[in-house]
Amino acid sequence: MDHRLLEIVACPVCKGKLTFDKENQELICKLDRLAYPIKEGIPVLLEPEARSMGMDEGR
């Protein structure tokens, strides 16, 4: 994931900052506890595609 891209993308729900989870290939919104998938190198920033994170994830 290009770090320059992380500087400009935002969570589509809260407009907050996203972090990259290299292991799971997801962009994480810690505020909303949502994980957006990255498919074939392209972030899928659609709320219906996001996965709700468990309480123990993303800490």
Swiss-Prot record:
It comes from Vibrio vulnificus (strain YJ016). The lineage of its organism: Bacteria, Pseudomonadati, Pseudomonadota, Gammaproteobacteria, Vibrionales. SUPFAM superfamilies: Trm112p-like. Gene3D superfamilies: 2.20.25.10. One of its GO terms (cellular component) is cytosol. Pfam families: Trm112p. This is UPF0434 protein VV2354. Belongs to the UPF0434 family.
